[in-house]
Every structure is written in C-alpha cells, then in structure tokens.
Amino acid sequence: MVKFTKQFEGQLVPEWKDAFVDYSQLKKDLKKIHLFTNGVEKKHTETSLIKTVKSSLGRLSIFGNKGREQSRVIQVHKKLASSGSNNDVYETELLEKIADDTDAAKEFFACLDMQLNKVNQFYKTKEKEFLERGECLKKQMDILIELKDAFKQKQANGESTQESKEDDSISCTISCEYDSVRGRTEEMQLQVSCLDNLEDNGEEALESLGSEEPIKANNEDSKLTTVSSRVFSCQGKNVKIKIPLTNPSRTFSAISYLINQSSSKKNGPDGGNKLQISKKKLSHAEKMIKGALTELFKGLNYLKTYRNLNILAFMNILKKFDKVTGKQILPIYLKVVESSYFNISDKVMILSDEVEEWFIKHLAGENRRKAMKYLKPHHRKESHSVTFFIGLFTGCFVALLAGYIIVAHLTGMYRQHSANTFYMETAYPVLSMFGLLFLHLFLYGCNIFMWRKARINYSFIFELGSKNELKYRDVFLICTASMSAIAGVMFVHLSLLEKGYSFRQVQVIPGLLLLGFLLILICPLNIFYKSSRYRLISVIRNIVFSPLYKVVMLDFFMADQLCSQVPMLRNLEYIACYYITGSYATQDYEYCMRVKYYRDLAYAVSFLPYYWRAMQCARRWFDEGETSHLVNLGKYVSAMLAAGTKVAYEKERSLGWLCLVVAMSSVATIYQLYWDFVKDWGLLQHNSNNPWLRNQLMLRQKSIYYFSMVLNLVLRLAWLQTVLHSSFEHVDYRVTGLFLAALEVIRRGQWNFYRLENEHLNNAGKFRAVKTVPLPFREVDEED
C-alpha cells in the first residue's frame, strides 16, 4: 500500500506546493509527541483497566451528549484577521491536557491552525482570481457572439459582393489609438510583485493579496507601442481588439497599418476611420478565447484538487494524532475544517460548469465530446511494448556498434595519416553528425526522467500539449531505434568497402541515410510521432526567422541547444554541399573546401546559432522592455566574436590571432559562466540558507550542485584545445573533434536540468500553474 505522504506529494500541483498543507512538518511535530509519550510509557508500565473501560464507554453513542462533551478536549475559535480583512483565522484552545508533553501538543495545534488559515486564504485568493477571469471571459464571449451575429446578418441581407465572399468583413469605426506592450508588461509585473510577497511574508502576504485591488500601470510615458490592438465601435459598443504580433504576417500587417494610418491623417480626418474586421481576425480571436477558457478550466480543476487533497491531509494527520495520544480530536477538528471556506464554497464548481457549458455551446458546436478533447485532454498511456523495443533496439545498437568498431580497427580507418582519408572526409561526417544529434536527444530523455522524478513541471514550462509531449520512454525509443539503423547502415557501408567495393559504388549509402531521416521528419502521415515532429519543425522555423516571431520558452530553449551543436551544423553543411553539388559522383571531396562561397558559408554556420539567440533576446526586449534581455544579448555577441576569432585562427595560425583567441574566449567564458550560475541556474546567492546556492533546491544532496558547477566550468574550457592542439595518440583529429563536441553536448544536457529547475521554482514562487492567455477584446469608454 502506498503511503499517504507519497500519494499526497505525487498528486499535488507542483507550482502550489508551498500553499498546500505542510504535511511533513505536521508529522515532525506529531513525532515529538510520540517520542515523549513512548518515553513516559517505559517509565510507567502499569495500565489502568478502569480508565480503558471508561474511555471505551465514552465513545458509545448510547451515552448521548454527555459522552461527547467529555471527549471535547479542544475548542477551535474563529476570529477575524488582525489586518482588518474579511479572512477568517482559526485558533485552537486546549481545554485539558492532551499529551504528556503539553508544549509539543500546543506546538502541533499552532502549526495545524496555521496550515488551515493558509489553505483558506490561498483558496480565497485563487478563487477570486479565477472568478474575475471567468467574468472577463464571459464578456469576451458576448462580444464574439455579437460580432459573429453581425457577419451572419450581413450575409442574410445579401450585402456582400463576390469579392467580399472571399474575405467577408464588417466595417467598424475606430475610436482611439493603439495599446502599449511595455505598459501591459509593467502592469503584469506589478501584479506579480504582489504574489512575490507571498513567499517572503507567508500569511500576511496572502491576506494582502486577497484584499488588494487590481493595480493598473500608467503606460502614457511608454514609447514602445504596438499596433496589435485597435479600437472599434460595433453593435453599440466601443471595443478594443488586440491581436498579438506573434508571427511575421501580423508584424508586417501591423507596420502597413501604421503607414496607412499616417497617410490617412494627412488626407483628412475621415480617411482612416473605418476598420475592416474580417472573419480571419474573428477566427483568431475565437482561438484566443478558446485557449483562455481551456486554461481557466484547468485552473479550476487544480483548485478542486487543492481542496480535496488538503481535506485528506487534515483527516490523515488527525487520525495519526488520535492514534498517538488516544484522544478523539478527529471529529472535533475535522468538523471545523469541513465548515471552513475552502470546503463549503461552491463558486468554483459553478464556474467550472459554466465554462464547460460555454465551450460546448459556442466553441464546439454543441458537441460535448469535441469540447472535452480541449478541456480534458487524455494523456497517452505508457505501453510496456515501448519498454520492450527500447531493450531490443539497445541490444541491436550495441552489437552493430561493436561490429563497426572492430571492422574500423582492422582497416585502420581512424588512425592518423591513414590512407583511407576519403572515408574520413565523406562518410565519417554523417556518422558524427547523427552521433551528436542522438546523443543530445538521449540526454534530453534523461532530462525528462529527472524532471519527472523531481516533480518539475516541464510540460507546463514548454507549453506542451498532451498530443506533442514526448515521455522519456518515447525519447529513448527514438534514440535507440535511430542509432540502430545508423550503426547498421554504416556497418554495411564499411563492410562493403572492406570487401573490395569502390567508393564510387557505395558512396551514395550515407546520403540515402540522411535523406531517409529528412523524409521521416517531414512525413505527413500520422506515424512516427507526427505532432511532435511538426512541433519541432515549427520551433526551428521560429528560430530561423528570429526576431519576426514572438519568443516563447521552448523557442529560446531550443536555440540554446543549437548553440551547443555548431560542429553538427558544420557537418550537415558539408554533407549537403557534398551531395547537392554531385561531388560524391566525381569523388572530389575537396571541392566544397576549395569554393569560396562554401568557406564563407562555413564561417556563417559557426555564427548562426548565436545570432539567432541574440535576435531572440532583442525581440524579448522589444516585447517586454527588460534590460536584462539586452545584457543576455551581449553574452551571445561575445560568443560570436570568440567563434569568429577561432575560425580566423584555424585559417591563419599566427601569434596575433592566437592572442586574440585567448582574450575573446576568456571574456566569453567568464560571461557565460556568470550567466549560467547566477541567471539561468539561480545559484551563487551569498545570503542563501544553502551556502552559495539558493534557498530552495529540488535535489536533496547539495554536493550535486557544487559538483555540477565545477563540471560546467571544466567543460566550458574545451576551447583550450584550439590553443593547445591536443589530440589522442594515433587517432585522427576528426575523432578528437567529435569527442570534444560530445563533451559540449553533455554539458548542455547537464545545463538543461538546472535551467528548468530554476524556471520551475520561479513559477512556484509566483504560484503560476496555468498560462495567462491574452484576450482579444476590451471594452473602453467613449471618453477614452
């Protein structure tokens, strides 16, 4: 049977962990009473039969109220909070001696009261937040329905021409200017700062958070604005529509709108007062409302879970207390818990039913099953067959890799000054590229395993849906199956060369292997994790076209991964040139190295990941206005300069370039180490409870964090190989390069865990368990 502690910790909302009943602390307080009681029993071994009979008779209901009053050893008082808010505070008074250690009993009930007050206040705060969100979404639905009715009425009256049938729209009058991104960001930050106080001030912060009015930031002085929001008058209401600039088409349309608006002002006051609201815009607005309703429904379910688990926690700890002390406290205190606000309030249940009804009626076409796919998505069940195939493919990969290594050793392919240079220049880059790629993917699977074990909500951080979320077993299956295929193909390729086949006859095999993986990646059939593959393609697209796309956590996390895969990208570029130019047919592997534009492209590939990441920082600064993004941009600029000096030094090995490599690489390394430890991992806090770490740690062993910092430092210094020209004896320099590239991939895999741990703790500190989806419409006064 699973212990309640594990069951409780396994089912609670990770980001709200500090707001749940501190069950472990209550168990510690109860253990003090238990240890003291056991010590007294050893000194006084005699037992009283009369007391035992009386206590047993007192429990029987036949003795009525008299028996109940005798068992009433505590009284729970309900008071108003001293801060003057409407929050109730519970305080327990001991009417008689409960345990041999009275102080320990008082300490236990003080902690129990504190937990009950905390749960009540947090529930009220979140309930108020969700109710306000629900009221806002109800207005959004009304506006959306009204605009949809306007379209239907227009079509019914036959007003639309042949042109408008292609893109039906209604004309609305613009009544004011556009909104400010930074102003909205400041408002959000001020609201978040109130939540930050909760971690520092405990109950008082919860009280102030519950009683505080919404804070509005003054955005009049903000210079950075966006045309994503426009105000129009439709059906007797002034409504502001805000469509986020999340992709290039919206960004360019917003810029063209600004140009048209400025030209219309020159032509006259009435030149630009009409705004066409198309079906496309309404469709996007409907998507935004659908996403907001889904997140609200998820938050309401979290609040239900919060209530149920806390009730169980109170019940279990009171049962344990009764068992230790022999008293009947459970029925008395549990009655207070059941009558407290967080248990008797039904507002969350009512709102949850309303959200479900709205979704079914207006967004799912009265189809309940379709609505439930959005509101309650089913997660894929983990199959034992996946585990079986992981083991099968692992065995195949090990056997094929062993065979490949033996054949390579016998032929001397990887030795320095080998006669088989052609193989190392053409086939080996394919193997090393796939090796680095799937090593990275394997480490990502290890990351997922550790995140789940540490209760880090990575799917929420990455905004992964149930369809495109890969479990760690899925990742391991992809890795083992792919590497088995790669090792098998490369083993066959090398064996054919050993049997006397010419390079011309077998050289197409590595190219076909690469082509096969590319076809699987873009395959439109619903096989091989289609949703995850297409999500990966969309993320790569967002990175490549930075800063035109709005940057989310998954985008810049993936861009950071590419910064550690520069050798893989250079191999990919060389392989593409080798096969696209037809060099494999002429066996002229040096062609791609002789051509100037290829050499220039090789330099560009070394810069690209850092450039993409820098552009993402610029876009985040543009959207949010935080200077920390500009400082982060400087880190990637320093990395680009360091990479550029390394490439130049490889081309022209002079003392001047060597000094420049050392200087630039040292600056970039120090910059990156500081950002890794302080910003990305949140460590090196000198006033922390854990020396030079941070106050909250997801791993119990502090030594792991110190070891990880040292290991990250050592692996960051891999660039020294460029200066020292170190290599393994009798081993080709390309193998040495692969080994060093693999070390950087391992460093990135280690970095990933602590980066998401810090992000999760930031979410937990702000009790952020659901996304805040922007809403498309906002009513404004005519004066505005």
Swiss-Prot record:
Compartments, as annotated in UniProt: Cell membrane
Pfam families: EXS (PF03124), SPX (PF03105)
GO biological process: cellular response to phosphate starvation; phosphate ion transport
Recorded superkingdom: Eukaryota
Induction: By Pi deficiency in roots and shoots. Induced by sucrose, auxin and cytokinin. Down-regulated by abscisic acid (ABA).
Extracellular side: 409-429, 496-507, 676-703
Coiled-coil regions listed: none
Tissues where this protein is expressed: Expressed in vascular cylinder of roots, leaves, stems, petals, sepals and filaments. Expressed in receptacle, stigma apex and anther connective tissue.
Main location: membrane
Domain EXS: 593-784
GO CC, any one term: plasma membrane
Cytoplasmic side: 1-387, 451-474, 529-654, 725-784
Entry keyword annotation includes Transmembrane helix: yes
Effect of loss of the gene: No visible phenotype.
Transmembrane segments: 388-408, 430-450, 475-495, 508-528, 655-675, 704-724
Membrane topology: Multi-pass membrane protein
Keywords per UniProt: Cell membrane, Membrane, Phosphate transport, Transmembrane, Transmembrane helix, Transport
Record domain SPX: where: 2-335
PANTHER family reported in the protein's UniProt record: PHOSPHATE TRANSPORTER PHO1
Summary of the function given for this chain in its UniProt record: Contributes to the loading of inorganic phosphate (Pi) into the root xylem vessels.
Family indicated by similarity: Belongs to the SYG1 (TC 2.A.94) family.
Protein name, UniProt field: Phosphate transporter PHO1 homolog 1
Gene source species: Arabidopsis thaliana (Mouse-ear cress)
